[in-house]
Structures are given as C-alpha cells and as structure tokens.
C-alpha cells in the first residue's frame, strides 16, 4: 500500500499500463479489430448450442429476427455463421461460392462414407469435382433420367395398383405415406442396383439401413464441436451404433458389387457411354469407371460404395419428404386439390396413364410443387459449408474455418420476398419467373452454386409423376369428417424434416 502511495511509482505504473493498453490496441489480432456479425450471448463450453432446439431451422429463424439475417453463433468452440436472407445466401453461394464450397469435417459422415468419399460430404477440391462430374454426366444427366423413366412409370403404376387393392379390401382410411416411402425406395433401389436386388428381403434391409442412416446423421456429435468431449461417444453408444451402421451399409453394397462384377464378367457386359438409353443401373456405370472402362474418369472401390450410398440417403429421403408434404398441403387445401384435379384430368383426357408429354402441360401441378417446396424444403438447413479463407461479407469479417449454415426454410418464409409468406398459395408462381435451380436466392429448396443438389431434375421428375398419378386416379378426403384446417402439420426433427404424422385419407378410385 505504501508503494502505491508513492507518487513517482504510481506515475510509473500508470505509464506502464497505458503503454501495455496502447500496444494491445495497435498490435491486436486484425480479427479483433474488425466488425463481426452480431451474436446472441453464449455460455461457456457449449456456446450457443443450448439455443438450437429440436427444430433448429425454426430456432435459428427466431434468433435471426433479433440478431439479423447474418449472425455469428458458436457451437462449442466452432464459429458458425447463419444466413437467413436471400442477400446473405447470394453472397455465400454465388458471389463468394469458391470460398464457401468446402464441407466441415464430420465424424459421422466420415465413418458412413469411407472418409467422405461421396458427393454430399466430400471436401471441395479435385476429388469432389471428379465424383460430382460422374454423378452429373453419367448418373443423373437429363438423358440418363429419361432412360430411367420406364422405372418411375412402372413403380408408380405398382403403387396405384396397391392402393386400389387396399381400397377394395378395406373401407378404412389409407396411410398414403407408407405407399410413397415404398415407392421412392423401390425407384432408387432399381436405378442403383437393378431390379434383381429389389425383392422383399433386400428392400427390408435397405429400408432398415436408410432409417439408421437418417437417424444417426441427425445426431449431435459432441466431438465435432467440443473436441475434448469426443470420448463421450464411447459411453453414449454413438461409436458403437456408428460402427454397426457403417458395417451394415458396407456389407449390403459389397454384396451388390460382387454380384454385378460376376455377371459382367460372365456376360461381357460393359457401359457404353454413347448409348445412354440402355437399361444400365448406377452400379454398372460406377463399376465400369472403377475398372477403367470409361476414359477420363477414375474411382476406387470405396468411392463406388460412397457414391451409391449417397444416391440412397440423399435421394430416397428428400424425394419422399417432398411428396409427403405436397400431399399434406393438398389435403389441407381442398380448393387447390380440386383445381389440380381439374387440370390433371383435362390434360389426361380420359387416358389410363399419364405421359411425360402430359406432365409438360400441367402448369398448375408444377406451381403446387414449387409452393410446397417453398414452405417445406426437404433439408431446411442446407448442409453446412466452411470458409477456406478470411473474407468480408455484407460488411462483416468472417474468419477462415467458420462453418456456414444457410436457412433455406427461413428464406422461403421471409415476408420481405413473399407476400403472406405463411400461406399456401401456388398461384404466386404462375408467372413462371422462378425455378428450383438456385438462380433466385429467395427460393433455394435444393441449394445453389457448386454445392447445389445434382439430383434436382430426377427428384422433380419423380415428385411430379407421383402427385399427378395420385390425383388422376383417386379422390381424397380427410377421415372422420376432419376439417382441413385442423390437419396436424407438425414437423419431426432431423436433417431431412418429415411431417411427424403420416398422411391418412379416405381414398376413392376415380373412373378415367
């Protein structure tokens, strides 16, 4: 105390503290001096994880209303940028797409996809460009999708027949969700593996595998965000579940690979790139690339498995979810359903089957699906990206290594872009100026930029055909005199957000 009362010493200490303060101000990290996006208060260790909730797209939308369309959260020790406006999405997925095109490392996706050798989770780089090119040019091109159209038509025909049989055998309401999930599984399985592998037993295994994948991909892995807590996975059972699921997927796909290779060897079959119309399945195409029969492309065995599993996990769930929400909105809006009935039946003109040409004339069908996907994008929070360098976005500094989440669900309901945003109004798309391809950033149900969904054309083709055939063949009403406005539209939690309860309706076959 006496030392502090010494005027000379006090002056010297004051000067020293001032110099230290000045030094810190002058030489502090540039990041500290730069303007960063607004953030809600965070807790020690967990950061903002406690604010995410079971439906994160809704929680993050709520936070964005308070903190802005570009906000910075912390999930554990990881900075996470959340974009909730079209302007912010455009900055990330168009203006600075290359900087934000990689994926953050994920323990779960790494284990399920052979070290992220698939398309969805692979980090941005030469390998990702190669596998995406294979998917776009060899598996999911417009020509390839057309060559698989007979599969879509056959499987939807089977679905219609099965619903008819169910209506004949029982007057009870029909669980439409059961029929549509079976449909999407069958279409993807036949396209990926060939019809031989889509018998009842294999479909049971595939359905169980997909359910497991979907569940575990939605699990929070503490080690990804709080590295020193990674050991917890051993005690929660996550590591064990993950190992079993990865083995289950590997054994299933490996069995299909072995069968295809034996058959190709015995029959001398090979993929002819000049003849896209052949009934070749995805596995045949990928194995020809693996065996060096397609010039300019190369894949190892694990990559073949990872890409095939991508087709299942990405394709089945998103397509089924889109169909399911469309049916729900039609049941909830009888006047829209009536208008769609009229269009489909006028275009079909009494024919027993709807053709591809017919679908091209169904303008109202297309806007019904667009409006459904505006309100219910299958993956509301687009798969996370990661910044590869320091960058400035909308006047804010974003550090390299920041994870980025684009809230497509919030953007699709933003009243700044959508009049009466919470209402289901297909007519808003009738001017035809907006599509799914990610050019309009107020509407990005399938993402945009380099990381947009490569299966977009295929997914929309399946959804359109399914809804058109259901509306063509059946009339639907809610059971027990239920009021449309009372239909439960509660969402289930998950990476892909389903309707929590299945769509159940009274179904009556029409005379065409």
UniProtKB/Swiss-Prot annotation:
This protein's pathway: Alkaloid biosynthesis
UniProt record, GO biological process: alkaloid biosynthetic process
Cofactors named for this entry: heme
CDD domains, per database record: CYP71-like (cd11072)
Keywords assigned by UniProt, alphabetized: Heme, Iron, Membrane, Metal-binding, Monooxygenase, Oxidoreductase, Transmembrane, Transmembrane helix
InterPro entries for this protein: Cyt_P450, Cyt_P450_CS, Cyt_P450_E_grp-I, Cyt_P450_sf
Major subcellular site: membrane
The keyword Transmembrane is assigned to this record: yes
EC number: 1.14.14.188
GO molecular function terms noted in the UniProt entry: heme binding; iron ion binding; monooxygenase activity; oxidoreductase activity, acting on paired donors, with incorporation or reduction of molecular oxygen
UniProt topology in membrane: Single-pass membrane protein
Compartments it resides in: Membrane
Function: Monooxygenase involved in the biosynthesis of curare monoterpene indole alkaloids (MIAs), natural products such as strychnine, a neurotoxic compound used as a pesticide to control rodents, and its pharmacologically active derivatives, including brucine, used to regulate blood pressure. Curare alkaloids act as animal glycine receptor antagonists. Catalyzes the conversion of norfluorocurarine to 18-OH norfluorocurarine.
Family assignment from sequence similarity: Belongs to the cytochrome P450 family.
Name of this chain's protein: Norfluorocurarine oxidase
Source organism (scientific name): Strychnos nux-vomica (Poison nut)
Gene of this entry: NO
């Amino acid at each position: 105390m006496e030392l502090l009362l010494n005027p000379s010493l006090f002056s010297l200490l004051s000067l020293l503290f001032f110099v230290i303060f000045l030094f810190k101000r002058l030489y502090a990290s540039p990041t500290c001096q730069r303007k960063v996006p607004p953030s809600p208060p965070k807790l020690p260790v967990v950061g903002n994880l406690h604010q995410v909730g079971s439906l994160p797209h809704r929680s993050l939308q709520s936070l964005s209303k308070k903190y802005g369309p570009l906000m910075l959260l912390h999930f554990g020790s990881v900075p996470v940028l959340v974009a909730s406006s079209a302007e912010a999405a455009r900055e990330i997925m168009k203006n600075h797409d290359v900087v934000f095109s990689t994926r953050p490392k994920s323990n779960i996706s790494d284990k399920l996809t052979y070290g992220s050798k698939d398309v969805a989770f692979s980090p941005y780089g030469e390998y990702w460009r190669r596998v995406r090119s294979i998917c776009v040019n060899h598996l999911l091109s417009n020509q390839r999708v057309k060559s698989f159209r007979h599969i879509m038509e056959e499987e939807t025909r089977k679905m219609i027949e099965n619903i008819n049989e169910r209506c004949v055998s029982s007057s009870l309401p029909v669980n439409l969700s059961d029929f549509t999930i079976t449909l999407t599984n069958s279409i993807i399985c036949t396209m990926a593996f060939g019809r031989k592998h889509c018998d009842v037993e294999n479909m049971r295994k595939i359905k169980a595998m997909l359910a497991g994948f979907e569940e575990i991909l939605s699990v929070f892995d503490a080690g990804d965000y709080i590295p020193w807590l990674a050991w917890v996975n051993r005690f929660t059972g996550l590591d064990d579940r993950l190992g079993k699921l990865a083995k289950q997927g590997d054994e299933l796909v490996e069995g299909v690979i072995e069968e295809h290779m034996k058959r190709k060897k015995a029959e001398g079959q090979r993929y002819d790139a000049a003849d896209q119309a052949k009934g070749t399945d995805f596995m045949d195409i990928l194995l020809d690339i693996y065996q060096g029969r397609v010039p300019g492309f190369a894949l190892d065995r694990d990559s073949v498995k990872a890409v095939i599993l991508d087709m299942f996990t990405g394709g089945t769930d998103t397509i089924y979810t889109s169909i399911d929400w469309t049916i729900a909105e039609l049941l909830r809006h009888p006047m829209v359903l009536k208008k769609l009935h009229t269009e489909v039946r006028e275009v079909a003109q009494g024919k027993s089957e709807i053709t591809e040409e017919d679908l091209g004339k169904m303008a109202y069908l297309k806007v019904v699906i667009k409006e459904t996907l505006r309100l219910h994008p299958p993956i509301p929070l687009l798969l996370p990206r990661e910044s590869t360098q320091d960058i400035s976005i909308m006047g804010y500094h974003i550090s390299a290594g920041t994870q980025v989440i684009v809230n497509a669900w919030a953007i699709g309901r933003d009243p700044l872009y959508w009049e009466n945003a919470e209402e289901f109004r297909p007519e808003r798309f009738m001017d035809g100026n907006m599509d799914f391809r990610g050019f309009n950033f107020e509407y990005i149900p399938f993402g945009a930029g380099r990381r947009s969904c490569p299966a977009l054309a295929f997914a929309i083709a399946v959804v359109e055909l399914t809804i058109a055939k259901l509306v063509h063949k059946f009339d639907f009403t809610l059971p027990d005199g239920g009021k449309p406005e009372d239909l439960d539209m509660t969402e289930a939690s998950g990476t892909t957000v389903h309707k929590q309860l299945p769509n159940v309706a009274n179904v009556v076959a029409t005379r065409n």
